[in-house]
Amino acid sequence: IVMTQTPSSKSVPVGDTVTINCQASQSVYSNNRLAWFQQKPGQPPKLLIYKASTLASGVPSRFKGSGSGTQFTLTISDVQCADAATYYCRVASTNNIVFGGGTEVVVKGD
């Protein structure tokens, strides 16, 4: 399976909304396998969303995951400076783990 993530980068002002898309080359057998991560320089990836749409503990409700099948979306509402990072979708199966190529979110006024 190949995960195609778009856009590769996005620059947005504080308070705006960012939408990140992830398209799978084949249907994801179970949404339980789809997750979204946030990574900042020098830090390990942080789990934001699992099971395609479930917020991880401590993650603000401004982050929303949606989608099924081959199309998945991460939406960040009311973007804050702290949201500047690279975001990745990930599909885990019994055999392997596949990440999307990443989306760098740059927050204007950072």
From Swiss-Prot:
Q: Which domain of life is it from?
A: Eukaryota
The keyword Nucleotide-binding is assigned to this record: no
Q: Where is this region: Framework-4?
A: 99-108
Looking up SMART domains in the UniProt record yields: IG, IGv
Entry keyword NAD: no
Q: Where does the record place the region Complementarity-determining-1? A: 23-35
Please name the GO terms of the biological process aspect recorded for this protein, alphabetically. adaptive immune response
Extract the ranges annotated as region (Framework-3). Answer: 58-89
Framework-1: annotated span: 1-22
Region annotation (Complementarity-determining-3) maps to 90-98
**Which segments carry the region annotation Complementarity-determining-2?**
51-57
For this protein, the record's Gene3D superfamilies field holds:
Immunoglobulins
Q: Where does the record place the region Framework-2?
A: 36-50
| InterPro entries the record matches | Ig-like_dom, Ig-like_dom_sf, Ig-like_fold, Ig_sub, Ig_V-set, IgV_Light_Chain
Could you give one GO CC term from the UniProt record?
A: immunoglobulin complex
Give the matching Pfam families. Answer: V-set
Recite the UniProt keywords alphabetically: Adaptive immunity, Immunity, Immunoglobulin
* Miscellaneous section: This chain was obtained from antibody to the polysaccharide of a streptococcal group a variant and was isolated from the serum of a single rabbit.
Please report the name of this protein according to its UniProt entry: Ig kappa chain V region K29-213
Task: Show the taxonomic lineage.
Answer: Eukaryota, Metazoa, Chordata, Craniata, Vertebrata
